[in-house]
UniProtKB/Swiss-Prot annotation:
Recorded superkingdom: Eukaryota
Record region (Disordered): 1-23
UniProt name for this protein: Required for excision 1-B domain-containing protein
Cross-referenced Pfam families: DNA_repr_REX1B
Cysteine disulfide links: none
Organism from which the protein derives: Bos taurus (Bovine)
InterPro entries listed in its UniProt record: REX1-B
Source lineage: Eukaryota, Metazoa, Chordata, Craniata, Vertebrata
C-alpha cells in the first residue's frame, strides 16, 4: 500500500523550501527532459545511452582484469566497488530506455519503435547476465572448475547478442526515419 508519505517522496518540490499555508511542501511531478522531443532526438538519446552502456561494459571488463591480476590476495573490495558503480550506470540507462519505450508506445503511438526499444533492453539484460556469468566462471576461486566448452559458448552468446543489439539499433534508426 502506498502511503501519503511514500507518495510525497516520489515527487520533487516545485520550489525548494516553499510551503503552503498548511506547512506541507508543494510538489510537482518529475519532468522528463525528452517528453516533447522529436522522435529522432529520442532515437539519438537511445544511441547515447548505448554508448554509456558500452563504456560501462569496458569499465566492468577492466575492473575484472584488475581483480584477476591483483593477487593473491585478491582485491575483492575494489572489484565490488567497480561492479557497484557499473550497476548504477546500467540501472540509470535502463530506467531511461524504459521511459523512451513508454513514450513511444503511449503518447507517440509508435508501437514498432517501442518494440525495437524493448528488444534492445532485453538484449542488454541478456548481455549483462552473460558477461557476469563469464566473469564469475573466471574467478580464481573457480579456477580449474571452469568448463572450457561452456566458457566458449557463453563468449559466443555475448558476441551474438552484441550483433543482435547492432541490428536492433539499425532497425530503430531506419524505422524512426520512416516514422517522421
Amino acid at each position: 500500500m502506498i502511503t501519503a508519505e511514500a507518495a510525497s517522496e516520489s515527487t520533487v518540490p516545485a520550489v525548494p523550501g516553499d510551503t503552503a499555508a498548511t506547512g506541507v511542501p508543494e510538489h510537482e511531478e518529475l519532468v522528463w527532459p525528452w517528453k516533447d522531443a522529436p522522435i529522432r532526438e529520442l532515437v539519438q538519446r537511445i544511441h547515447q545511452l548505448q554508448a554509456e552502456r558500452a563504456q560501462a561494459f569496458r569499465r566492468l571488463e577492466e575492473g575484472h582484469r584488475q581483480y584477476l591480476s591483483s593477487g593473491p590476495p585478491y582485491d575483492f573490495p575494489r572489484y565490488r566497488s567497480t561492479v557497484h558503480e557499473v550497476t548504477q550506470v546500467f540501472a540509470a540507462a535502463s530506467r531511461e530506455v524504459l521511459a523512451v519505450e513508454a513514450e513511444l508506445a503511449g503518447p507517440r503511438a509508435q508501437p514498432l519503435l517501442a518494440s525495437h526499444v524493448r528488444s534492445l533492453q532485453q538484449l542488454e539484460e541478456t548481455r549483462l547476465t552473460t558477461v557476469a556469468l563469464l566473469q564469475l566462471m573466471g574467478t580464481p576461486e573457480l579456477t580449474g572448475q571452469e568448463d572450457s566448452l561452456q566458457m566458449h559458448q557463453l563468449k559466443m552468446k555475448v558476441i551474438k547478442t552484441m550483433e543482435a543489439i547492432s541490428e536492433v539499433l539499425q532497425d530503430l534508426r531506419f524505422d524512426a526515419e520512416s516514422a517522421e
